[in-house]
Amino acid sequence: MHQGSSEIVVLKPTTVFLAFLASQLPLNDVPDLASLHTDCTAYVINKHDSIEETVEEIEKNFSTMFRHEICRWLGNNARNDIETSFLDFLCCFKFELHSHIVLMEPTIEAGHQLLTIKPRALLLDWMRSEVEGEYELENVMEQATLSHLTENATVIVKNFPDLKEIKTFIKQYYRPIFETAMSRMSNQSSAWPEVNSFKSFSQYFAIEIHTQLIHLHY
């Protein structure tokens, strides 16, 4: 586990960014929102103790991030006034912050790709079943949503010279990945859902792939 001075922010484009792209691209070249949410860019930033400081860190680096996102979709020569506005940046992207980092490279600086371990709805159902009969915990879990579970989901920093290796890696190591993610939710491994195959693992967790992990503070 990486307990360092870094955390990771993943940028999720919004419909505002999609509308911006639509204003810049031929109609047939405009991506849909699902495409924008596939392989989102992940950025390594300095870790802070408060959300206010984290927002300040993002604001300090937003122009670099905004520029990169625009170039990803419009090409390196694209220029637009929107990239100078932090308010526009906030409208164009939602942030996912991750500080629970499993490092599989010598240093985080050496990492250039990222996997996010996202809980699925079946895991939330399991968590609710585990607190049945415990009134206070039942009330808490009834208010819980899948988005609560996916906040600060576990991420793995690992490089894949050939992207085809990713699926093989996940299939080979699904069990330790499962154990790492589950240990954050319950230390009673005997009570965990039974996962004895990649198929059963995939019922409880989805893997998001980020082929670009960009370091902003080095």
Language-model features: locations:
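Extended, charge-biased low-complexity segments
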Residues: 1-49, 108-160
